[in-house]
């Protein structure tokens, strides 16, 4: 069985990855990231944790955008997996369904919404949510398991409640050029 950790929207600069994400990444055979690392430092942190396949997102740095494509297709154990950041400009799944069909993939992993979604139909659509900056949901990632051409996908809600992640984000306050502290979330 092949285990794939799917993430998106980590939105970290110089901040450290949450320990729970590090642990899940170390236990996976492959990490896939659907964009919005934000910084090259975050991308490099994931590369140190294991094999990674990734695309860039709309909030990524110019360095990331030069390094990574906007979309890609990978094949794992005869399963075609599409990876893209923005699959739609709305909250419905019409865009992701069309994109999965156009990319001719059995699984589409996408980001941008910061909200976890799994839709099982003729294709598996997965948005892992965000492990650090969720929107109207708990912090999350997704785990894909491929076994003999069968694939299962599940959302993993991370241990800290949403309020804990707001606190975590605020502890990662950034210094602005004028020396004043700038909170990531109010």
Task: For the regions a language model picked out, list residue spans one by one.
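Active-site neighborhood of phospho(di)ester-bond hydrolases with catalytic His/Asp-centered motifs
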Residues: 6-8, 30-36, 53-58, 83-85, ...
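Conserved beta-sheet core of the metallophosphoesterase superfamily
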Residues: 53, 91-154
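Short, solvent-exposed aromatic-acidic interface loops
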Residues: 154-165
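Helix-adjacent hinge/juxtasegments
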Residues: 53-92
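Beta-strand-turn-beta hairpins that frame and shape the catalytic cleft
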Residues: 1-5, 73-82, 120-125, 146-155
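Short amphipathic alpha-helix with an adjacent loop that forms part of the alpha/beta core around
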Residues: 18-24, 75, 96-101
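Active-site environment of divalent metal-dependent phosphoester hydrolases
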Residues: 11-16, 38-42, 59-65, 88-94, ...
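N-terminal active-site segment of His-dependent metallophosphoesterases
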Residues: 1-52, 60-69, 138-140, 146, ...
